[in-house]
Amino acid sequence: MPASPPELPIVVLDALMPTTQRLVLNRRGSMVWEVQSHRGRYAVKVGYPIEATADWPAQPWTALAPAREGAVLHRLGFVDFAYGEWDQGTWNFQPWREGADLHQLWEPCRRPGSSIAPRASVAASCVQALAELHAKGWVHGDVQPAHFIIGPEQTHLIDLALARGGDVPKGYDFPFRGCLVHYEAPEIARSVLATGEAEPTEEADIYALGASLLISATGWRAMEYPDGAPRLVQREAVATGRRRPVKVRGELGELVDAMLSPAPEDRPTIYEVGKALN
């Protein structure tokens, strides 16, 4: 990308006619804006390809991710969104979700010497959001704390670019090559190491939710590997099940441990997790 400040694609400007806009994120093939317009408040996602560096191979799929997410939103029956192409990739816009993400909300639990236990009601709202996706026959594939937005009325599960469960246009589709390794289930890590690809599952989503609850409540990753380790080293640690001996305080502890079981068949279902919390 050029060094000049990024701008929204013309087609998005024409569609939304922003009154205000704020660049929230611009890294590794993805830009996100918060946009206010006469139509309402929107998140605008713009993708572009990642060029190869000494540390990273080229990643052309990042250019397709916003349109792929838009196609998923369409299949799931969402409204008030759009997606399309621009000269360096694809874009989408969708309603802005107000609230703090899971990691932000549980920050008081992670303070040194804190006696604050994570609230089971917050965990239950995250479970409900994931359960609604699973009930429609889809898996998320990229469950992590930043993707749960706990709003005033409900919790939203966002960022569906890697979701699987139905057809998306071939021109926007790409293989699943794993997710953020901190939340990647061991079986997913092993498949990516062996073949370069994997098939996301409900069981892997459950693991990722458990890892999300753990790190948000304690500040510790589920698996043990050095801070700043290369992704390959991280993934190898996950694949071998090198579990960190840390537990969530309070009533969530045993449940999160079960969700992080190394064998997918030993993890509770989303229904069982919800029942345990309610």
Label each region the model flagged.
Residues 134-150:
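Catalytic-loop of the protein kinase fold
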Residues 151-182:
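Activation segment/activation loop of eukaryotic-type protein kinase catalytic domains
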Residues 80-91:
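Short beta-strand micro-motifs within the conserved protein kinase catalytic domain, predominantly
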Residues 89-101:
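Conserved short submotifs of the Hanks-type protein kinase catalytic core
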Residues 28-71:
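ATP-binding glycine-rich loop module of kinase domains
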Residues 261-272:
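A conserved short helix/loop substructure at the end of the activation segment
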